[in-house]
C-alpha cells in the first residue's frame, strides 16, 4: 500500500466535497486513523475502504455543517493566475452537481480510479456506473460550456 498516493487521492476527494483545505486535511487524517484502527486486512482493496471511510466522514461533516465556503488560500499554493481561474471555475461547476455525480467525477477523472474500484465503493454495477458517469460528465460539460452563473 502506497500511503502517500492514497493520502493524496483521499485528500483531493475530501477537498472537493467540503471545499475547505483545513477540513479536508482533518477528514483525510481521520480517514487514515480509522483505517489503521480497523480490523481491515483485505489486500488490494484498501483504496475502496478508504473512500468509504472518507465519504462517511464528509457526510458527517456536512451534517454538522462544519466547513466554510470556498477558501481563498489557492494563492498561497503558488499557482499561476490563469490556473487559479480554471481551478475556481471547475470547483464551482462541480459544486452545482449532485453529491453522487461530483463523487463519481472526482474518483474517476481526478483520482484516476478504475471502474471496478468505483463500483466497489459505490455498490453500483458496471453498467449502472457507466450510465451514471456518462450522465455526470454530460451535466458537468453542460455547466462548463453553457455557463452556470445564470448568464
Task: Give each language-model segment a name.
Residues 1-12, 16, 22-25, 102:
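A short, charge-rich alpha-helical start-of-domain segment used by transcription regulators
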Residues 11, 32, 98, 102, ...:
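C-terminal flanking helix
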Residues 12, 26-33, 37, 44-56:
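Structural recognition of an alpha-helix C-terminal capping motif at a helix-to-coil junction
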Residues 45, 52-72:
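Arg/Lys-rich amphipathic alpha helix in sigma70-family domain 2
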Residues 65, 72-95:
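Acidic, proline/glycine-rich intrinsically disordered inter-domain spacer in sigma factors
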Residues 104-108:
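A short pre-motif secondary-structure segment
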Residues 116, 120-148:
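DNA-recognition helix of helix-turn-helix
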Amino acid at each position: 500500500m502506497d500511503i502517500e498516493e492514497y493520502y493524496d487521492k483521499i485528500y483531493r476527494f475530501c477537498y472537493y466535497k467540503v471545499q475547505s483545505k483545513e477540513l479536508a486535511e482533518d477528514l483525510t487524517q481521520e480517514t487514515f486513523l480509522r483505517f489503521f484502527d480497523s480490523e481491515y486486512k483485505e489486500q488490494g482493496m484498501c483504496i475502496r475502504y478508504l473512500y468509504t471511510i472518507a465519504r462517511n466522514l464528509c457526510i458527517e461533516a456536512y451534517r454538522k455543517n462544519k466547513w466554510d465556503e470556498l477558501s481563498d488560500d489557492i494563492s498561497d499554493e503558488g499557482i499561476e493566475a490563469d490556473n487559479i481561474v480554471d481551478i475556481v471555475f471547475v470547483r464551482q461547476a462541480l459544486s452545482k452537481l449532485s453529491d453522487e455525480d461530483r463523487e463519481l467525477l472526482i474518483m474517476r477523472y481526478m483520482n484516476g480510479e478504475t471502474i471496478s474500484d468505483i463500483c466497489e465503493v459505490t455498490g453500483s454495477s458496471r453498467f449502472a456506473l457507466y450510465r451514471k458517469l456518462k450522465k455526470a460528465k454530460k451535466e458537468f460539460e453542460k455547466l462548463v460550456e453553457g455557463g452556470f452563473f445564470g448568464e
